[in-house]
């Protein structure tokens, strides 16, 4: 990893003050033009539509319907928010009472917008097969965010000068090319890498604008995906602060708008759900679901259901004992807290306890920092393991999805570092994957030292994962090479799911 001092040493004397500002996207002449569009599951039969504009909207509105030529329904809100250093306002409108598993067309109300479409969420309990794509640690491409492998080998550089509208490269391009193969996207942490602005020397003279420019460019690049697919987000360390190294001198210079997950919270806070009302016939499940809803704090920790899976999103950065990004944490990022002491773990237990396997047989937990990884101690979050792993085992979580380490990894079902003897055939321990190789300015992390529970590790090119919920008992996991679409690894987890509620 480069440091700011390394960058400054490489510059001519007294040149810093004369460096050009970062490359912002052009502001449209119509300031109501929607940009950076994003969709999310907001609740049962509900989808939130989020977008940014270059002026505050008094009443953001969305027109929609099941025909592209008949957008006869309209919903509006009063949600148009910003923060100190942002050039844009984040707008949110929630579309409710949608027919499940149906193609809807929508248009953000503006004098300069187009019609887009999305597939509405499946009802909890729908046992139809579906696939979700998992993309983590995804950065901006172009002048502010070229990608280069972390090992520094110049023969393995990947320089991407610009992003064409066709999205014909790497992970975003593969998501576009395989549009019909998946129904929604899971992205637990690290968006854009604006806090790495100092790695591009031309940014060093104007870090405040460089940070915002990277965010604007990244979310513009992501919009063709996130504006047409439900895109579920939770935080990573690169959302925490204006720079990622935890250097006190830079910490003090971070403006208020670029501290404490501000952009992430403003951008996604009104889009993500709290948790779903339980559709279980069990009274205790309903009580736990209601408790979880009261304790949820989106976009940091929350849950949702889609067809036959219950997904619990966690914050591995703050709000649990010894959290790495918390004040005085090991990462030095001074983030949070976002709830009362113990709130996230209270939510986590109530939410897991609420899951009725006759409705949603599959239980998935997604967060950013892993506690199983190759490459040594620096790649794992021991505090996360202490906080979350016992509850994941107790309530029978089937799969843990994480990133942070910039490669792709798959692990045998494991608990407390002991591999489940059943392997992939009805284990009691959770299976874990890392899908952190999507591509960003920091490049790929070498596989490094292996561990006994690892079954696959890949760090040669950018990649991501897909999860296919085949039926109530079989979950297929594939890792895909972004550039080619080749399958790098494929496995299937079998779970009998004979118990309505798991507590082991």
From Swiss-Prot:
Disruption phenotype: Leads to the up-regulation of genes involved in biosynthesis of amino acids, ABC transporters, and metabolic pathways; and down-regulation of genes involved in DNA replication, cell cycle, meiosis, and mismatch repair.
Keyword Magnesium tagged: no
Glycosylation sites: 84, 112, 168, 260, 415, 450, 474
Subcellular location: Secreted
Main location class: secreted
Signal peptide region: 1-22
GO cellular component, one term: extracellular region
Key words, A-Z: Glycoprotein, Hydrolase, Secreted, Signal
Entry keyword annotation includes Glycoprotein: yes
Induction comment from the UniProt entry of this chain: Methylation at positions A1306, A1341 and A1666 of the APHA mRNA is regulated by the MTA1 methyltransferase and controls its stability and subsequent translation.
Protein family: Belongs to the metallophosphoesterase superfamily. Purple acid phosphatase family.
Oligomeric and partner information: Monomer.
Function per UniProt: Acid phosphatase involved in the regulation of fungal phenotypic traits and virulence in C.parasitica.
The protein's name: Acid phosphatase A
Source species of the chain: Cryphonectria parasitica (strain ATCC 38755 / EP155)
Lineage: Eukaryota, Fungi, Dikarya, Ascomycota, Pezizomycotina
């Amino acid at each position: 990893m480069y440091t700011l001092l390394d960058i400054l040493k490489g510059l001519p004397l007294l040149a810093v003050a004369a460096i050009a500002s970062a490359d912002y996207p052009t502001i449209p002449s119509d300031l109501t033009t929607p940009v950076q569009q994003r969709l999310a599951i907001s609740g049962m039969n509900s989808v939130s539509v989020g977008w940014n504009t270059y002026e505050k909207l008094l009443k953001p509105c969305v027109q929609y319907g099941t025909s592209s030529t008949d957008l006869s329904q309209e919903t509006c809100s009063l949600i148009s928010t910003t923060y100190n250093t942002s050039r844009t306002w984040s707008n949110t409108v929630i579309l409710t009472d949608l027919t499940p598993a149906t193609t809807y067309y929508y248009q953000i109300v503006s004098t300069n917008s187009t019609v887009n479409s999305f597939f509405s969420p499946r009802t909890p309990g729908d046992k139809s097969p579906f696939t979700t794509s998992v993309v983590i640690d995804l950065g901006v491409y172009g002048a502010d965010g070229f990608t280069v492998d972390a090992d520094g080998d110049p023969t393995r550089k990947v320089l991407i000068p610009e992003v064409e509208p066709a999205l014909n490269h790497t992970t975003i391009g593969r998501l576009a090319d395989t549009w019909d193969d998946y129904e929604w996207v899971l992205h637990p942490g690290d968006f854009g890498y604006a806090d790495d602005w100092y790695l591009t020397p031309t940014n060093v003279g104007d870090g405040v604008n460089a940070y915002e420019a990277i965010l604007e460019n990244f979310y513009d690049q992501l919009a063709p995906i996130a504006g047409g697919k439900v895109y579920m987000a939770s935080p990573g360390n690169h959302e925490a602060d204006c720079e990622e190294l935890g250097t006190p001198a830079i910490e003090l210079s971070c403006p208020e708008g670029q501290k404490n997950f501000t952009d992430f919270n403003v951008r996604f806070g009104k889009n993500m759900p709290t948790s779903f009302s339980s559709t279980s016939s069990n009274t205790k499940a309903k009580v736990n679901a209601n408790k979880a809803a009261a304790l949820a704090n989106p976009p940091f920790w929350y849950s949702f259901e889609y067809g036959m899976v219950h997904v619990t999103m966690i914050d591995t950065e703050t709000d649990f004992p010894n959290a790495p990004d918390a004040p005085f944490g090991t990462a030095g990022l001074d983030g949070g807290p976002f709830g009362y002491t113990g709130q996230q773990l209270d939510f986590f237990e109530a939410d897991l306890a609420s899951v009725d396997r006759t409705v949603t047989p599959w239980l998935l937990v997604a967060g950013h920092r892993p506690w199983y990884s190759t490459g040594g101690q620096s790649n794992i979050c021991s505090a996360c393991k202490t906080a979350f792993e016992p509850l994941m085992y107790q309530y029978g979580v089937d799969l843990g999805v994480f990133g942070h380490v910039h490669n792709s990894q798959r692990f045998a079902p494991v608990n407390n570092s002991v591999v489940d003897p059943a392997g992939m055939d009805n284990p009691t321990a959770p299976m874990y994957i890392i899908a952190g190789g999507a591509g960003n300015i920091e490049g790929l992390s070498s596989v490094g030292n292996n561990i006994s529970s690892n079954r696959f590790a890949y760090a040669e090119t950018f990649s991501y994962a897909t999860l296919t919920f085949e039926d109530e008992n079989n979950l297929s996991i594939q890792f895909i090479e972004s550039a080619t679409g080749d399958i790098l690894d494929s496995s299937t987890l079998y779970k009998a799911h004979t118990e309505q509620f798991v507590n082991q």
